[in-house]
């Protein structure tokens, strides 16, 4: 099975007025997704943020849990942070995976809409099981990534609909 990587994208993101913005880092972005990544054997979790002050905040929080007081207070959280990497762009995340794996990853994302390159979860699983190329699944914040960014990816995972839709 190919390696799975995930990333949480904070730029370029749309706000509710369809303006391009950068979203702020939240605690959930760091702690909870890092722990879920370890649980589900994700190869690496990328926190993707373009603003240096926000990356510095994330670095400070991560260091607290990796080597500061938090590392002895809650060792499980320390372990979760071993798979987290802070980068300033999607392109850097892709290059990092390429450096690790020796091949460019398949890049997929999620959206509530369908696109020409929308793929089912079953088909994406086949890629992971059979193709051998690593897969980077990106998740947007705010009101989602810009259309131009979405169109640059290999695949968009099909929307998940609830009972009321």
Language-model features and meaning:
Residues 112-115, 141-144:
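Short glycine-rich anion-binding loops that position phosphate/pyrophosphate groups of nucleotides
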Residues 118-119, 165:
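Short, charged, surface-exposed secondary-structure boundary motifs
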Residues 2-112:
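RNA substrate-binding interface of SAM-dependent RNA methyltransferases
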Residues 48, 110, 138-140, 159:
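Generic beta-sheet signal
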Residues 126-130, 145-146:
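Helix-rich terminal scaffold detector
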Residues 132-138:
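Loop/turn-to-beta-strand initiation segments
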């Amino acid at each position: 099975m190919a390696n799975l990587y995930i990333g949480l994208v904070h730029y370029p993101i749309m706000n509710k007025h369809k303006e391009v913005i950068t979203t702020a880092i939240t605690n959930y972005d760091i702690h909870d997704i890092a722990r879920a990544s370890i649980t589900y054997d994700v190869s690496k979790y990328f926190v993707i943020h373009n603003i240096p002050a926000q990356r510095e905040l994330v670095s400070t929080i991560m260091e607290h849990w990796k080597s500061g007081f938090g590392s002895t207070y809650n060792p499980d959280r320390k372990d979760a942070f071993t798979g987290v990497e802070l980068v300033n762009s999607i392109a850097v995340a892709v290059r990092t995976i390429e450096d690790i794996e020796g091949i460019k990853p398949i890049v997929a994302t999620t959206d509530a809409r369908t696109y020409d390159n929308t793929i089912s979860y079953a088909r994406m699983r086949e890629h992971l099981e059979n193709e051998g190329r690593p897969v980077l699944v990106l998740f947007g914040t705010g009101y989602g990534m810009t259309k131009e960014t979405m169109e640059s990816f290999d695949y968009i995972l099909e929307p998940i609909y609830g009972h009321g839709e």
